[in-house]
Design a protein with these regions (language model features):
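Bacterial N-terminal signal peptides
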Residues: 9-20
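Cysteine-nucleophile amide-bond enzymes
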Residues: 26-674
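Bacterial N-terminal signal peptides that target proteins for export
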Residues: 1-11
Length: 674
């Protein structure tokens, strides 16, 4: 049965090839795209004092226009010559580069907000600006990926133009370009046209240099395939291994994860790379490449036997070190709970070195998840594999960084309980105390404080902005959930304003429309908590679970059985956990259910003849659901058939529709009129 995940990947490319012209856009001023990019940059606040409420709406309007024009240019309407296709690609690459520069400039402003009096109104405006920048960068990245793929297809049969496309990607140091032209390092697949001009080894080397410079880890599978191919020229094998080293050779699985079907194995291991490179005769290489081979073999030999040699792990275009704080951004129901919103990051972890039972040293992330009864650790590259946007913060003092890394390492495997009251006082009680066997009860950001408080610096140097629950009815409604914002609360976003921490590394954001639907639902829940009366409506199973948790308060045997079944720590309040879980399950059902409907609706509009789908493996039930969704969106479908609907416009319309549907369902479930 075809998976929803496949549909999410397949639809954008289908739309790009299927959507044709619209006359209104075709007659517009060709320079409007760059003009809107410039206007977007002009409207961005440059200083903290510029962050006034009047900034946001014009800024968001400019972002919408930048994205709209990018989508229009990506249709390549009236562009027939390959050289003109490349000229348009260069415009899109330049715009993406400029937006990412603005994002860097925005993050550089973060320290200004703690100079003098702290003005949370200005901070919230800045957070709104940065959230918009992150979203726009991700949207343009998705659009650019489709556009560069199209350009690569258009110039595939012309060696000169193909080289120019590679040159464009190199000049712009484009990670999207690296991900697209990376396929050229491999032999053409059997189904490729036979008259395609061959790609020279020199071009393949340049592409590998681009992959390394951009830190494009998505190309690890292709690099692994290249060095496994016995037909690959030996010089290319050596340089492919060097490229893997530069973007980060995957670490071996932790011994605890070997044989666990839920943990994906690494794309390639140090041991396999060592064996493949050892099979390359140095006498068949020039002197410089032979010396590089020797250096790589020494590095790989140590790595396969002992793990990491030093105290850093290469992750794309930057290094991760022990004591670094990982900040992640994904859709979350907790993103708007505090007065420091919208949160730019929703979860955290701490990097540290772990020496496994096999004697190998690995860079891992330690975190405190909501579900689970022990502090987990996971290889850093695996931990961030599905994250839309993340950054690492670092204290530049190596001594302080080591203290924090050691503290994180000390609690791996300890009992844990997620504190639904988001308190930090239990963490304060652990200051300067050994942690062997100590149960950790806090929440994800509390883990940062657990590490930071061991340094000589006061707490305010790491978390300079006090946070409270969002206004209105938030605190009262949270109590009905079994939640509260504790005294001295800290959030994943709050540490971003620390004057002590630098941004050690950050990736450009990703965008996924299904995540946007989910975020709309989660954000509406937070809005409802602030402005409406929360009325929980658990289903029968959830009600019974709450009653069972209440009974377990007087029955230790039942309590222990419940904790094992629900995978929660010994210190967690069972009743509060049951109430919260009932709400979270409903939230997830609404958010993920509507994001899946978005995916199916987009496919229903764009997939063509529905009667051919059974032959492609779709069930009769799926086909009927697609037919129903096509009828629901008949107007969009007809516009798509006529060629008057842009890919972006279809996405925007469906995201809005299913986001609004999800919000209405939330109101029915939780915020019924009194």
């Amino acid at each position: 049965m075809p998976a929803i995940a496949f549909l999410r990947v397949a639809c954008p490319a289908v739309l790009l090839l299927a959507v044709s012209a619209s006359t209104a856009w075709a007659q517009a001023n060709d320079a409007a795209f760059e003009q809107w990019v410039d206007l977007y940059a002009q409207r961005m606040p440059k200083r903290a004092e510029d962050c006034t409420p009047q900034v946001l709406e014009p800024f968001k309007k400019a972002a919408d226009m930048v994205e709209s024009w990018a989508a229009f240019l990506a249709r390549f309407e009236g562009v027939s010559e390959g050289a003109d296709v490349l000229a348009r690609i260069d415009r899109l690459l330049a715009a993406k580069q400029r937006i990412d520069e603005l994002l860097d400039e925005g993050f550089a402003m973060r320290g200004q907000f703690i100079e003098g009096n702290i003005d949370k109104d200005r901070i919230r405006v800045w957070l709104g600006v940065m959230s918009n920048l992150i979203d726009l960068s991700g949207r343009l990245k998705l659009q650019l990926s489709e556009s560069v793929n199209y350009a690569a297809f258009r110039v595939a049969s012309d060696a000169t133009l193909r080289e120019r496309l590679v040159d464009l990607c190199i000049r712009r140091n484009s990670e999207v370009g690296a991900a697209v032209v990376g396929v050229l390092i491999l032999p053409p697949p059997p189904q490729a046209p036979q008259d395609l001009p061959p790609v020279s080894d020199a071009t393949k080397l340049r592409i590998m240099e681009l992959i390394a410079a951009a830190g494009e880890r998505s190309q690890l599978p292709r690099l692994a395939q290249l060095i496994r191919d016995p037909e690959t020229p030996m010089e290319l094998v050596v340089h492919a291994v060097d490229t893997i080293r530069k973007i980060g050779l995957p670490q071996d699985l932790r011994p605890e994860d070997v044989g666990n079907d839920e943990v994906d194995p690494p794309v390639i291991t140090a041991d396999e790379v060592f064996g493949l490179l050892e099979g390359v005769p140095p006498t068949r290489l020039d002197a410089k490449t032979a010396e590089l081979r020797k250096e790589l073999l020494e590095w790989l030999d140590y790595r396969r036997k002992h793990g990491l040699e030093g105290n850093s792990y290469r992750l794309g275009h930057f290094d991760v070190q022990p004591g670094d704080w990982l900040l992640m951004r994904n859709p979350s129901p907790y993103n708007l709970f505090t007065d420091l919103h919208p949160g730019l990051f929703t979860h955290v972890g701490v990097a540290t070195i772990e020496k496994g039972s096999d004697g190998k040293r690995r860079m891992v992330i330690v975190d405190l998840p909501e579900r689970g009864s022990r502090i987990p650790a996971e290889n850093v590259e695996a931990y961030i594999s599905d994250t839309l946007h993340f950054a690492f913060l670092r204290h530049p003092n190596p001594e302080y960084a080591k203290i924090m890394g050691d503290r994180a390492a000390a609690i791996i495997g300890n009992d844990s309980s997620f504190d639904l009251n988001f308190r930090t006082d239990r963490v304060l009680d652990l200051k300067n105390k050994p942690l062997d066997g100590v149960a950790i009860k806090t929440y994800c950001a509390g883990l940062l404080l657990l590490c930071a408080q061991e340094t000589p610096l006061p707490r305010q140097r790491f978390f300079p902005i006090p946070e409270t629950a969002r206004g209105g009815n938030t605190a009262e409604n949270m109590q009905k959930l079994g939640l509260s914002i504790g005294k001295d609360f800290i959030s994943p976003t709050g540490c971003l304003f620390s004057p002590e921490l630098i941004i050690a590394g950050r990736v450009t954001p990703l965008y996924e429309p299904t995540r946007e639907v989910e975020e709309m639902v989660f954000d509406h829940f937070s809005y409802g908590l602030e402005n409406k009366i929360f009325t929980p409506s658990p289903d029968l199973y959830q009600s019974l679970r709450v009653k069972l948790a209440e009974a377990a308060e007087q029955n230790p045997v039942l309590a222990e059985a419940l904790r094992k079944k629900e995978n929660i720590g010994r210190e967690m309040d069972l009743v509060a956990a049951a109430k919260t879980q009932a709400v979270v399950e409903t939230l997830d059902e609404v958010a993920y259910g509507h994001s899946d409907l978005f995916t199916m609706a987009r496919f229903a509009v764009t997939c063509g003849d529905l009667d051919r789908l059974p032959g492609l493996g779709y069930s009769s039930e799926q086909v009927e659901q697609f037919r129903m969704l096509r009828q629901r969106h008949q107007d969009l479908y007809e516009r798509f058939l006529k060629g008057t609907l842009m890919a972006r416009d279809l996405r925007v319309a469906l995201v809005k529709y299913y986001g609004e549907q999800g919000k209405e369902e939330l109101d029915r479930r939780f915020f019924r009129e009194q």
